[in-house]
């Protein structure tokens, strides 16, 4: 029922404006120093940079799309405990649960232009590799619990391969092969 509510609510409340995040540069009355200080205070297992891209996304979600942000925060209250339990089972950093916000804006029915589906944005082949059932009636990529389990397994595997959370996260987004290519192109520097 939550999936159906989300689809209808987000369709009805869609922000009238869409943004090309590659070319837009938002302005805010909040000084950069405030954002920088808040990011520094966050306890994280990875380095959190602050740059124009990060600033743009902070402004987008906090100032340009407050309704969507409110919906995402509401969904987080429901789904994050499920993700925490799953990620704890795999002894993963709990902060990785926030990847569902980045991947899909907490939309269990999200579909990317490339064909990735669900909250955790699994491509068909990767979903099958991690045991998600997909046929003409069922697509477990759209199941937040089962896809979170697959995401945790993928992240654990990626961390075992790369030994670095930044690379494991990059691998989740673009695939291990592309991360390996980038490492080779950089002369082994990460």
Where are these regions (language model features)?
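An acidic, Gly/Ser/Thr/Pro-rich helix-cap/linker signature
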Residues: 1-90
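Membrane-interface junctions
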Residues: 89-92, 161
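Active-site-adjacent helix/loop patches that line small-molecule binding or acyl-intermediate pockets
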Residues: 176
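Solvent-exposed, polar/charged alpha-helical surfaces in well-ordered, non-transmembrane soluble domains
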Residues: 74, 81, 85, 97, ...
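Short, functionally critical alpha-helical segments immediately adjacent to catalytic or ligand/cofactor-binding
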Residues: 92-109, 168-173
């Amino acid at each position: 029922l939550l999936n159906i509510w989300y689809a209808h609510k987000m369709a009805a409340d869609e922000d009238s404006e869409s943004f090309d995040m590659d070319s837009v540069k938002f302005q805010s009355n909040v000084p950069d120093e405030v954002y920088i200080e808040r990011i520094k205070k966050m306890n994280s297992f990875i380095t959190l940079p602050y740059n124009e891209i990060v600033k743009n996304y902070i402004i987008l979600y906090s100032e340009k799309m407050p309704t969507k942000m409110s919906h995402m925060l509401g969904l987080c209250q429901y789904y994050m405990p499920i993700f925490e339990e799953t990620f704890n089972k795999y002894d993963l950093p709990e902060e990785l649960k926030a990847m569902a916000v980045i991947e899909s804006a907490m939309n269990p029915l999200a579909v990317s232009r490339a064909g990735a589906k669900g909250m955790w944005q699994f491509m068909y082949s990767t979903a099958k590799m991690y045991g998600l059932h997909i046929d003409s009636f069922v697509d477990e990529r759209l199941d937040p619990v089962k896809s979170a389990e697959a995401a945790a397994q993928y992240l654990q595997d990626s961390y075992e391969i790369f030994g670095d959370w930044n690379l494991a996260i990059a691998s989740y987004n673009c695939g291990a092969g592309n991360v390996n290519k980038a490492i080779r192109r950089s002369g082994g520097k990460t």
